[in-house]
């Protein structure tokens, strides 16, 4: 199972956002939506062997983790509004006190923090421009790739990854959009 974890540092944790203003009023939820699509979509199909996690850290009640399961997700279309609408529905459903709850088929919501989520995962790969070139790294297809939205991970978040022994891997020396990084990782992994 391939996993992607994206931290949305400003992505709101309330359902009271407009699907017409994902970059502004929703705290860059547009980035999260594009990352969902980059993770899961193929031409005319979904990647059933991929899970996507968005850690929403915006106001008013961070953290909230939303999980999309490629195997089980329904009602997802390849546009920004569709995954954002599913996130909105999950937030409307409410955040469970413990564990995770299925909000819509294949979309789950929980109160897990970045540290909680990362500490429960293995084979961590931190995508960072200063890492080892991805083409020289052995990939099994069972990695968890961690990246951030338009902001860098905080030193505290990086410390969590370091404590778990995450490999720092680079897609190149340039900075790319998060969703583009996910497409490149999927392409690179598919070729092996």
UniProtKB/Swiss-Prot annotation:
Keywords: Cytoplasm, Methyltransferase, S-adenosyl-L-methionine, Transferase, tRNA processing
InterPro entries referenced in this protein's UniProt entry, alphabetically: Alpha/beta_knot_MTases, TrmY, tRNA_m1G_MTases_N
Binding residues annotated for S-adenosyl-L-methionine, in chain numbering: 127, 181
GO molecular function, one term: S-adenosylmethionine-dependent methyltransferase activity
Subunit text: Homodimer.
E.C. number(s) listed in UniProt: 2.1.1.257
Presence of keyword Cytoplasm: yes
Name of the protein: tRNA (pseudouridine(54)-N(1))-methyltransferase
């Amino acid at each position: 199972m391939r996993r992607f974890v994206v931290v949305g540092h400003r992505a709101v944790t309330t359902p009271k956002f407009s699907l017409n203003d994902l970059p502004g009023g929703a705290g860059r939820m547009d980035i999260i939506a594009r990352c969902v699509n980059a993770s899961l979509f193929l031409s005319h199909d979904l990647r059933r062997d991929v899970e996507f996690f968005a850690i929403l850290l915006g106001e008013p009640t961070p953290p909230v983790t939303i999980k999309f399961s490629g195997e089980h997700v329904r009602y997802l279309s390849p546009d920004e509004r569709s995954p954002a609408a599913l996130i909105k529905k999950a937030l409307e459903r409410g955040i469970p006190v413990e564990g995770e709850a299925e909000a819509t088929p294949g979309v789950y919501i929980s109160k897990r923090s970045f540290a909680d989520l990362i500490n429960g995962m293995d084979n961590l790969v931190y995508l960072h421009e200063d890492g080892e070139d991805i083409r020289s790294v052995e990939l099994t297809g069972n990695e968890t790739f961690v990246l951030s939205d338009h902001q860098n991970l905080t030193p505290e978040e990086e410390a969590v990854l370091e404590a778990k022994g995450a490999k720092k891997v680079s897609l190149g020396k340039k900075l790319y959009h998060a969703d583009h990084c996910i497409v490149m990782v999927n392409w690179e992994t598919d070729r092996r």
